[in-house]
């Protein structure tokens, strides 16, 4: 038993020793491996260090070489710049030297010219003195004579050129205007009616006058109060005269009297009834006439106020010419002229029809010149275009025409108004206009006598030949014509004729 235990213990000891030995062997191998790994790592690290150092040295060498090359290039560039600067300095020096020489020559020539100029002035002064001694005139007198001569010759030459240009332009303008106007007038036919501010109503007998007057004048007072017209009952047999500046009220009075005379019942109540009925009739006529003229002229889109204003023109007259007929005629003429001149005929026709619309307003008198502005304001408030509004306002030159359409409206208006038989003037207006023409001519210096002839269509002026020569007579005619245009209003045109007579009388003995 002991032997067995001893054997086991001995075996255990032996096994432990063997294990220790084997462990030491393994430890030695591990140490050898560690040492080997350490050595290899150190070698590898050393190799990498050497490689890094070598690469760094190589990179530094490359950079150093590059820097050296850059430095050499910059040095070369600086050297080249210095060479160019030196060349420029040399060039500038040469130029400065040349300029200095040139300046010296210029200074020398200036001094030379100044000396020559001084000599010339001295000689000129000497010559002027000699000329003054020879001619007996001073320098200023001679200059005035030369200036007057040059001015006279220049005026004469300028007047010749102006006259020639005016003649050529007048011939061309007359031809074109005649062609257009002849073509226009051939295509228009209008009815003309002259009206007055006085109307008469025929009576069946003179007894009717008493009935119209009524007891204590009640009937005639009622008529005049309701209508606003003067009813004149005088010695005129079988007639009553109606006087009223407003043609609508005149027409109302005439129709009312005719209705009352035909009916035979004349008293204030009946008068009031008839006036009411006739007023409605006239309002209907105003509306119908306005719509009729718009339809006849094929004009669309007019405001109701404008149509009614046109209808009121049916009862109005200007210088005896019916204003609605005149407006319609002007529209037809304007449309034809617009087509001839390649303008918009619709716009021109519209403006021509409405050009006297201001006379259709109750606050404007028949021949008032303010109707143009008032009519333009009405047209603008009714939505008419700016061209139409300006044409209405400018047709009497109260404002400046801003379009060719406005000029055409003026021309068409003048053609309709100035043709023979279109208008009549009162005797006072006629005499005053002739007197005004003569007064304008007498306001100019040198006018001896003046005669307005041909119903004011021509002014013949006799001038003093000592004050007015041939050239001044042309200017005088132009100035008188301009003053007439500025201060007077008239249809058509007025001819200004200057007569200058030189009469020499000598007796043979």
From Swiss-Prot:
Entry keyword set: Cell membrane, Endonuclease, Hydrolase, Membrane, Nuclease, RNA-binding, Transmembrane, Transmembrane helix
Subcellular location: Cell membrane
GO biological process: mRNA catabolic process
GO annotation, cellular component aspect: plasma membrane
Disulfide-bond pairs as recorded: none
Chain ranges of the HD domain: 323-418
Keyword Nuclease carried by entry: yes
Gene Ontology MF term list: RNA binding; RNA endonuclease activity
The UniProt record lists the keyword Nuclease: yes
Annotated membrane topology: Single-pass membrane protein
Source organism, top-level taxon: Bacteria
Main subcellular localisation: membrane
Transmembrane spans: 3-23
KH domain segment(s): 197-257
EC number of the protein: 3.1.-.-
Family that this chain belongs to: Belongs to the RNase Y family.
Function summary: Endoribonuclease that initiates mRNA decay.
Protein name as annotated: Ribonuclease Y
Native source species: Borreliella afzelii (strain PKo)
Organism lineage string: Bacteria, Pseudomonadati, Spirochaetota, Spirochaetia, Spirochaetales
Gene it is expressed from: rny
């Amino acid at each position: 038993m002991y032997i067995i235990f001893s054997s086991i213990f001995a075996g255990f000891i032996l096994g432990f020793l063997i294990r220790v030995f084997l462990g030491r062997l393994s430890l030695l191998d591990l140490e050898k491996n560690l040492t080997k790994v350490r050595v290899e790592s150190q070698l590898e690290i050393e190799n990498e260090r050497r490689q890094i150092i070598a690469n760094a040295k190589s990179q530094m060498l490359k950079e150093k070489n590059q820097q050296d090359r850059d430095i050499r290039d910059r040095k070369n560039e600086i050297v080249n710049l210095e060479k160019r600067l030196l060349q420029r300095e040399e060039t500038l020096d040469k130029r400065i030297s040349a300029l200095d020489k040139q300046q010296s020559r210029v200074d020398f020539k200036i001094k030379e010219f100044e000396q020559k100029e001084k000599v010339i002035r001295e000689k000129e002064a000497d010559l002027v003195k000699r000329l003054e001694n020879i001619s007996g005139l001073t320098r200023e007198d001679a200059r005035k004579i030369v200036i007057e001569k040059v001015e006279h010759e220049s005026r004469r030459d300028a007047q010749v050129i102006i006259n020639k240009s005016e003649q050529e332009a007048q011939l061309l303008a007359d031809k074109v205007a005649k062609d257009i106007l002849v073509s226009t007038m051939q295509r228009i036919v209008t009815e003309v009616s002259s009206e007055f501010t006085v109307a008469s109503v025929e009576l069946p007998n003179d007894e009717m006058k008493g009935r119209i007057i009524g007891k204590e004048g009640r009937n005639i007072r009622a008529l005049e109060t309701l209508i606003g017209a003067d009813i004149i009952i005088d010695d005129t047999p079988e007639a009553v005269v109606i006087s009223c500046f407003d043609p609508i009220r005149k027409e109302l009075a005439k129709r009312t009297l005719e209705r009352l005379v035909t009916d035979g019942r004349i008293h204030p109540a009946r008068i009031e009834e008839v006036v009411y009925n006739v007023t409605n009739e006239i309002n209907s006529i105003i509306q119908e006439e306005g719509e009729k003229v718009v339809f006849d002229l094929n004009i669309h889109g007019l405001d109701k106020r404008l149509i009614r204003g046109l209808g009121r023109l049916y009862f109005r007259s200007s210088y005896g010419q019916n204003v609605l007929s005149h407006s319609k005629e002007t529209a037809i003429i304007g449309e034809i002229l617009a087509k001839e001149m390649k303008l918009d005929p619709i716009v021109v026709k519209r403006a021509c029809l409405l050009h006297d619309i201001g006379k259709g307003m109750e606050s404007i008198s028949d021949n008032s010149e303010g109707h143009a502005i008032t009519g333009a304001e009405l047209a603008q408030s009714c939505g008419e275009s700016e061209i139409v509004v300006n044409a209405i306002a400018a047709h009497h030159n109260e404002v400046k025409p801003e379009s060719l359409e406005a000029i055409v409206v003026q021309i068409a208006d003048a053609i309709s108004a100035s043709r023979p038989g279109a208008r009549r003037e009162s005797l006072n207006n006629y005499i005053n206009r002739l007197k005004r023409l003569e007064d304008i001519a007498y306001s100019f210096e040198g006018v001896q006598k003046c005669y307005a002839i041909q119903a004011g269509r021509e002014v013949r002026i006799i001038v003093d030949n000592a004050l007015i020569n041939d050239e001044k007579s042309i200017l005088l005619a132009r100035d008188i014509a301009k003053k007439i245009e500025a201060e007077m209003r008239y249809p058509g045109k007025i001819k200004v004729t200057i007569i200058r007579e030189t009469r020499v009388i000598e007796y043979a003995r």
